UniProtKB/Swiss-Prot annotation:
PROSITE patterns: AA_TRANSFER_CLASS_2. It catalyses: L-histidinol phosphate + 2-oxoglutarate = 3-(imidazol-4-yl)-2-oxopropyl phosphate + L-glutamate. It comes from Geobacillus thermodenitrificans (strain NG80-2). One of its GO terms (molecular function) is pyridoxal phosphate binding. Pfam families: Aminotran_1_2 (PF00155). Gene3D superfamilies: Aspartate Aminotransferase, domain 1, Type I PLP-dependent aspartate aminotransferase-like (Major domain). Its EC number is 2.6.1.9. The keyword Amino-acid biosynthesis applies. This is Histidinol-phosphate aminotransferase. GO terms for biological process: L-histidine biosynthetic process. The keyword Lipid biosynthesis does not apply. PANTHER family: HISTIDINOL-PHOSPHATE AMINOTRANSFERASE, HISTIDINOL-PHOSPHATE AMINOTRANSFERASE 2. Disulfide bonds: none annotated.
Length: 365
């Protein structure tokens, strides 16, 4: 038996190490996981009761249209309910658009490094992948425009970008959209939207009225703290959503996930508190890096990429053996550093202490 040609040699996604895995491997009792950009403060206190209220309905299929959640998200964004596409995490939304638009003979344009699932799903659909290197950690939109031709179907802009945390501002984005041909879909991945504090970050929902080919993706996995439940969504024109709906699997978001996301969306006070604490801790990371001569990309997310000027796997391993899980830049296309999720003050204190010790040992400061 043989799988499809495009799957041969295509590696599966490798998530960061789990807490239990590290405990067993290194005999540690306390682990800090700062590898997957999860919310260290959890989710809204209202989520648990919303989940408990659904436990008697586990034998019943979920609402495949996610009506209650759809209504809340539409009201929150000021869009029509028919402009929304829900997925089992925004990963599935990526998959749906690739399934709907890409095929052999087409191509897709993206930055590198960026969120890897754009490339992964494009390869599965046997489309050509055109990758444009970041410049100073940021999208090179001019170079991306030059890669577009008559066979281009999707351009991906991760904003803010993962793994660098940098962003495309409103002026840059508008200038880019004005030059993208009308036959090309532009997907803006805003997974970290809630964490952004930059004044010139684009508010993209109103742009849907100006650019018919625009898609915005957001998620409940990051700031809302519902990564385990897998709820993401796309926002686009009614006609575009209608066209791609057949590519969506039925019942793709669970009853529990829908209920949890709906109440989490209501608790914007929780989100504001998380964002405020995240920004304060990011500033502490900046000061730490500057005091120790470490390069970093200023971030509009809940993570920071730090360039140590050495093998990222070595930094990753040093921290791992001391109970701190981060992401090696080698796995992300930035081999001389690591990506660290911004944790609580106590977690970050331990990170600073451990990195300081490492730098003294290796005499990198």
């Amino acid at each position: 038996m043989q799988v499809k040609e495009q799957l041969r040699g295509l590696p599966p996604y490798q998530p960061g190490k789990s807490i239990e895995e590290v405990k067993q491997e290194y005999g540690l009792s306390e682990i800090i996981k700062l590898a997957s950009n999860e919310n260290p403060y959890g989710s809204s206190p209202t989520v648990k009761s919303a989940i408990a209220a659904e436990l008697d309905r586990l034998a019943v299929y979920p609402d495949g249209y996610a009506r209650a959640l759809r209504e809340k998200v539409a009201n929150h964004l000021g869009v029509k309910e028919t402009q929304l596409l829900f997925g089992n995490g925004s990963d599935e939304v990526v998959q749906i658009f690739c399934r709907a638009f890409l095929e052999p003979g087409t191509n897709t344009v993206m930055a590198t490094p960026t969120f890897p699932q754009y490339r992964h799903n494009a390869i599965i659909e046997r489309a050509e992948v055109r990758e444009v290197p970041l410049v100073d950690g940021r999208h090179d939109l001019e170079a991306m425009l030059k890669e577009i031709d008559e066979n281009t179907r999707i351009v991906w802009v991760c904003n803010p970008n993962n793994p660098t945390g940098t962003y495309v501002n409103e002026t840059e984005l508008r200038a880019f959209l004005d030059r993208v041909p009308s036959h090309v879909l532009v997907v803006l991945d805003e997974a970290y939207y809630e964490y952004v504090t930059a004044d010139d970050y684009p508010q993209t929902v109103p742009l849907l009225q100006e650019y018919e080919q625009l898609v915005i993706m957001r998620t409940f996995s990051k700031a809302y703290g519902l990564a385990a439940l897998r709820v993401g969504y796309g926002i686009a024109s009614e006609s575009l959503i209608r066209a791609v709906e057949p590519a969506r699997e039925p019942f793709n978001t669970s009853t529990i996930a829908q209920a949890a996301a709906a109440v989490a969306l209501d608790d914007q006070a929780f989100i504001r508190a998380c964002v405020e604490q995240n920004r304060a801790e990011l500033e502490r990371y900046y000061r730490f890096c500057e005091e120790h001569g470490l390069k970093y990309y200023p971030s509009q997310t809940n993570f920071l990429f730090i360039d140590f000027g050495m093998d990222g796997n070595e930094v990753f391993q040093y921290l791992l053996e001391r109970g701190i899980i981060v992401r090696s830049g080698k796995a992300l296309g930035l081999p001389t550093g690591v990506r660290i999720t911004v944790g609580t003050k106590e977690q970050n204190d331990r990170v600073f202490e451990t990195i300081s010790h490492m730098l003294r040992e290796k005499q990198l400061t």
